[in-house]
From Swiss-Prot:
Record bears the keyword Plastid: yes
Protein name per Swiss-Prot or TrEMBL: Pentatricopeptide repeat-containing protein At5g46580, chloroplastic
Segment annotated as transit peptide: 1-43
Record lineage: Eukaryota, Viridiplantae, Streptophyta, Embryophyta, Tracheophyta
GO cellular component, one term: chloroplast
InterPro entries xref list: Pentatricopeptide_rpt, Smr_dom, TPR-like_helical_dom_sf
GO BP field: chloroplast rRNA processing; ribosome biogenesis
Key words, A-Z: Chloroplast, Plastid, Repeat, Transit peptide
PPR repeats mapped onto the chain: 185-219, 220-254, 255-289, 290-324, 325-359, 360-394, 395-425, 431-465, 466-500, 501-535
Domain Smr residue range list: 614-696
GO molecular function: deoxyribonuclease I activity; rRNA endonuclease activity; rRNA primary transcript binding
Pfam families in UniProt: PPR_2, PPR_3
Length: 711
């Protein structure tokens, strides 16, 4: 006979104050206000006979709570455990701030197409629609009536998916909808929207989406992804973000395709913090980003030049065991270039080769740009030889990038070999950018004869002359004092449709400053007048001795404001050179002062406790000589006022990154020699040094009143 055991247990619950908030998620607050002491009755039944008092040992020890509950656990707890099929992933979630998932880990499944027996006829009809050219919409609509089979759901969907031009797709969609033969499902809208996306027709896509909302048609992940990516292609980032937020409001979770697209949108909008927040929240919910998502992150950090961010992307990919593809490597290489890390870019490229991937044209172009920017000529040429040996793909952009790198560094022989390779190539014949790069190389090396021969060859080949090529050739001929050829090239370029820009005008100004006769100067002035009449008026103004300073100041302001920012300093340099060539030295000093006043020469003067320096690296020869003279005047006045001077004075001309860029340093050294200035060539090239004692002594000899002021 079963025996019933009944016992009473006192249970006391004392919650900690710090845990109140945590327990309030599960218990009502009223439970904590009730009595904390409860009596619970527990009944247990057993088939065994109860022991008598004589059999029960006498003990004074009070049984613990676990001992009292042991009979209950023996009858209510199951001995066998539920088998777990797979090991669950452990994800830590902060209990005080729980976050819901931000995306669905399952991609939107595409609708399966059922077999259509009329597929052959319908595809032939779609091919006819694609090949036909229509000037009027009515012509296309009349042709739709010739559809070989009734436009039911499957037939209409097959034709809609086979059309290529977005105008025809949109018209066919509206035609089917007007028939009202069947309800328009989401897939019809998605197919039409994708076609409109190719045509960058965001307004039509948005109208269709709003129409879906109005008619109660469901918008799925494919719909939202198409809307967002189309807005991104049209640079309508605010619209993309608006539809992404609207997606969340409807309760639909984006899949990884939509999520990667919105990451790219936030990235292009410059919202780095939002991108990282979305990325980290998605990873915390179990998302494993693919190569596309990492490419977005790498591009974002690369455009900002954030090397630490690029390292973060590489570490994340490694920790998640995501192998980058060629697109990701291209993005990261471009990012390394913007961050100024050529060594790391080379290591990344070698890692790509070791992974068994073959670089494409974009990969090689990005690497050549990095090497060219860093002046790594040897590495760039080795890469070129490796390209030819392994027969890697090369296109126009890659060839021209290599040529431009040779032009920047001054590698004439290598550029000629590369240019000849392009001539022998079937697919990559030289274009106007290729010829421009070669003209730049010959111009920088002073090879006027070769430059003219190349120009004539360019005309015979029927290659269009561009303004940059004209500028390079005019500069080369001007340095060679071949003024008649300058006029010939300029006239021919204008006839060929070249529109002069500020760079070409600045080049004509520099040629005018080099003219040794008034006749040559007038020829160049005639060319400049066809390009910029206001500039010619200002040149006549500054060489006139009767022009007052205030007039020069006002006209200078108008000319500079009408000039592109990158051409303003070259303009001022050339104008100073023209004044010095016409023995208008005081006017040259006025123009230098105005240029400094309007911010054209930042960093011209630098001062520390130990040394003062004059940086003329961005100045022309005449402007550098004028700046030196002005600096000496200022130092003479400082000595006159008996102010403190440093122990060392420096003048920096630089050596230039180009092999032929030694003109400024040589001309500046010659000018110092003519002045008998105490500056001497330093061990570092392009730097001239003078001590305080030598400079003060020289200034006192040049300005005798200083001797009495120092006595």
């Amino acid at each position: 006979m079963a025996t019933v055991l009944t016992t009473a247990i006192d249970v006391c619950f004392n919650p900690q104050n710090s845990d109140t908030k945590k327990h309030s998620l599960f218990l009502k607050p009223s439970l904590f206000r009730q009595s904390r002491s409860r009596k619970l009755n527990i009944s247990c039944s057993s088939l065994k006979q109860p022991k008598t008092l004589e059999e029960e040992p006498i003990t004074t020890k009070t049984p613990s709570l676990s001992e009292q509950l042991k009979p209950l656990s023996a009858t209510t707890l199951r001995q066998e455990q539920t088998q777990i099929l797979s090991k669950p992933k452990s994800v830590w979630v902060n209990p005080t701030r729980p976050k819901r998932s931000v995306l669905s880990l399952q991609r939107q499944k595409r609708s399966a197409y059922s077999y259509n027996p009329q597929i052959k006829d319908l595809r032939a009809f779609a091919l006819k629609l694609n090949s036909s050219i229509f000037t009027e919409k009515s012509e296309f609509l009349s042709l739709l009536d010739e559809i070989p089979h009734p436009p039911n759901r499957d037939n209409a969907l097959l034709v809609l998916n086979s059309l290529r031009e977005w105008q025809k797709t949109h018209t066919f969609f509206n035609w089917v909808k007007s028939k009202s033969l069947f309800p328009m499902e989401t897939i019809f809208y998605n197919v039409t929207m994708k076609s409109l996306r190719f045509g960058r027709q965001f307004q039509l896509i948005e109208e269709m989406a709003l129409e879906m909302v109005k008619d109660g048609v469901e918008l799925d992940n494919i719909t939202y992804s198409t809307i967002i990516t189309c807005a991104k292609r049209c640079n309508l980032y605010n619209k993309a973000i608006e539809w992404f937020e609207r997606m969340y409001k409807t309760g639909l979770m984006p899949d990884e395709v939509t999520y990667s697209a919105i990451l790219d949108v936030y990235s292009k909008s410059g919202k780095v913090e939002e991108v990282l927040s979305l990325y980290e929240r998605a990873v915390a919910t179990g998302w494993k980003p693919d190569a596309i998502a990492f490419s977005v992150l790498g591009k974002m950090f690369g455009e900002a030049g954030d090397y630490d961010g690029i390292r973060y992307v590489l570490q994340e990919m490694k920790s998640m065991d995501v192998k980058p593809n060629v697109v990701v490597y291209n993005t990261l290489l471009e990012a390394m270039g913007r961050a100024g890390k050529p060594g790391l870019a080379r290591s990344l490229f070698n890692e790509m080769l070791e992974a068994g991937l073959t670089p494409n044209e974009k990969t090689l172009t990005a690497l050549v740009k990095i090497y060219g920017k860093a002046r790594w000529a040897r590495d760039a040429l080795q890469l070129w030889e490796e390209m030819k040996a392994k027969k890697w793909p090369m296109d126009f952009i890659l060839y021209n990038t290599l040529l431009n790198m040779c032009a920047d560094i001054g590698l004439e022989e290598e550029a000629e070999r590369l240019f000849n390779d392009m001539k022998e190539s079937v697919q990559c014949r030289p274009d106007n950018f290729s010829y421009t790069a070669m003209l730049n190389i010959y111009g920088s090396g002073g090879k006027a004869e070769k430059a003219m021969e190349l120009f004539e060859e360019m005309l015979k080949a029927g290659v269009q002359v561009n303004v940059m090529g004209c500028t390079c050739l005019v500069q080369c001929l001007g340095k060679a004092k071949r003024i008649d050829d300058v006029v010939y090239v300029f006239d021919l370029s204008i006839k060929r449709g070249v529109k002069p820009d500020d760079r070409l005008c600045g080049c004509l100004l520099s040629v005018m400053a080099l003219c040794e006769s008034s006749e040559d100067a007038e020829k160049v002035m005639a060319c400049l007048e066809r390009a910029n009449k206001k500039l010619v008026t200002f040149v006549n103004l500054i060489v006139d001795e009767k022009t007052e300073y205030e007039t020069v100041k006002e006209e200078f302001k108008l000319v500079i404001n009408a000039t592109q920012v990158e051409a303003r300093r070259p303009f001022c340099n050339c104008l100073i050179d023209i004044c010095r060539g016409n023995n208008r030295h005081e006017r040259a000093h006025e123009l230098l002062y105005l240029g400094t006043l309007f911010g054209l020469y930042p960093g011209l003067h630098n001062k520390t406790i130990k040394e003062w320096s004059l940086d003329v690296r961005s100045l022309s020869v005449g402007a550098a000589e004028t700046a030196l003279e002005e600096w000496m005047r200022t130092l003479a006045n400082i000595i006159k006022r008996q102010e403190e001077l440093p122990e060392l004075f420096l003048a920096q001309t630089g050596t230039g990154t180009h092999r032929f860029s030694q003109g400024l340093a040589n001309s500046f050294a010659l000018h110092l020699q003519q002045l008998s200035a105490p500056f001497r060539q330093s061990d570092r090239p392009g730097i001239f040094v003078a001590t305080k004692e030598d400079l003060v002594s020289w200034l006192e000899s040049k300005f005798p009143p200083l001797v009495t002021s120092q006595a």
